[in-house]
Each structure stands twice: as structure tokens, then as C-alpha cells.
């Protein structure tokens, strides 16, 4: 999955075990992200993933909220926001803690729905990513429960003129504004 639409302010300095990253490139909403098309869906998934990584690298959930209006994923990442805001730690070791590899050229329509789609792929957590914790031992980001190499799907729905990442907990009357670690 490729995404290359970022706002850059100053020279990017990667995080280390001694200091957090500086001037992390901020994902910008692609012009076609809300189009009801395969290209629009791809742009949405790419932006969603870039925003997810941005929260992990900065604690700033503002870009994620543009891809997650109901704050489902932003809330699930709140521990990172609090960690950065409280100067308790940061992520280091990689610029992209989470990557996704889509394994088909197009998504599949979810059965029984005209607005939901699944795009199969693999989600991987970087083995190099670590979490620095002030006054404590650093931790690996990837754990035995991380979904590495596991076949997953980006499950999305088009509703109210935009794409939403689904969690898998929506049921048939989805609250179309959610996302999932099991879906993506």
C-alpha cells in the first residue's frame, strides 16, 4: 500500500531511543479520498494507514479523525496520544510501524451489501518498532498477539459521501463510522 501525500515542515529527524521524532511528515487528505470508486477507496485506505502511523509516531490524532469521524480508531490509539502529551515516551526504530500489503488488484463487494467492500491483504507490525518509556524499560511494539503476516481484509463502507473503515462489530445495521484491527 503506497501513500505519498504529506505536509512537510522542516527536516524530518527520526526518533531514537534518546529522543522523539521531529517534523514527522503529516498525512494530507487525498483529493479523491471520498470518491465512490476503487481509486477513492484505495486513497482512503492509504490515508487511513498513514494517519494510523502518524498517531503512533507523534500522538497527534487530528489526521486520523478525518478518516475516522466517529473516533473509533483515534480512541483506540488514545494511549499513544496520552504518552506523547505527557512526555512519558515515544515510538522509535521505524518510520512506518504498521504496513499493509493488498493482495488483489481490486476489492470485493461484501455479500448482502451494496455499500461494503473487503480488500484482502496482509497487515504487518515492524519488528524494529520500539516504545521508549521514560524511567522504564523500552518495549517492542510488535508482540506475540500482533497480526503479523495474517491474512486480513480492509473492510470499508461507503456512506454519506465518504468511506469508513469497519471494525467487524457493525452488524447489518452498521454505525458506519468505525474501524478495526481485525479488518485492516
PLM regions with names:
Residues 1-30, 174-184:
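N-terminal low-complexity, Pro/Thr-rich disordered segments
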Residues 15-93:
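Core segments of small alpha/beta cavity-forming domains
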Residues 68-71, 79-81, 96, 104-106, ...:
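A mature extracytoplasmic/lumenal domain signature
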